[in-house]
């Protein structure tokens, strides 16, 4: 039976895999920095960061049905990260994690890449609305937009 539970250090490898795969899938097409996405950004280093920095896991919840398929990280009222393993997207996992963040942690805002239309649609289905706030991503032409409930 699927469960949403608090992440543990033992989840570090899956958290890192899911995050890396999503970064490459969702952000590489816009930022196209090969050295970062395919060298600096790697599962081994991120897994170690999860293990070495308990604050990365402290407010992270995983969707687990025998295999960790996605996770959400909350920072105060912000949904800081929400990722589902690409192979399992479209099965309601992201929505379940989002509902958990809203109901159990009081999350009510997030930042999302303006061009990530799929994520924006998911958030809108769960009561989030785009605001006028936009933040340029470093020295790029890309923007993060704020969504609130």
Write out the residue ranges for each language-model feature.
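Conserved catalytic-core motifs of GNAT/GCN5-like acyltransferases
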Residues: 111-113, 129-146
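Conserved beta-hairpin
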Residues: 57-70
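A short, internal acetyl-CoA/4′-phosphopantetheine-binding micro-motif in the GNAT/acyltransferase core
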Residues: 78-89, 112-113
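Conserved acetyl-CoA-binding loop-helix of GNAT-fold acetyltransferases
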Residues: 90-103, 121, 125
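Conserved GNAT-fold acetyl-CoA-binding loop/helix
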Residues: 20-49
């Amino acid at each position: 039976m699927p469960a949403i539970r608090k992440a543990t250090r033992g989840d570090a490898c899956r958290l890192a895999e899911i995050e890396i795969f999503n970064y490459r899938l969702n952000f590489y097409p816009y930022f196209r920095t090969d050295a970062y996405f395919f060298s600096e950004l790697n599962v081994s280093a991120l897994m170690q960061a999860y293990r070495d920095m308990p604050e990365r896991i402290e407010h992270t919840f995983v969707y687990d049905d025998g295999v960790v398929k996605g996770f959400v990280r909350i920072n105060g009222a912000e949904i800081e990260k929400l990722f589902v393993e690409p192979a399992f997207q479209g099965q309601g996992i992201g929505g379940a994690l989002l509902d958990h963040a809203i109901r159990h942690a009081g999350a009510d805002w997030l930042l999302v890449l303006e061009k990530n239309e799929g994520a924006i649609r998911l958030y809108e289905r769960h009561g989030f609305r785009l605001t006028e706030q936009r933040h340029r991503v470093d020295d790029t032409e890309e923007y993060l937009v704020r969504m609130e409930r």
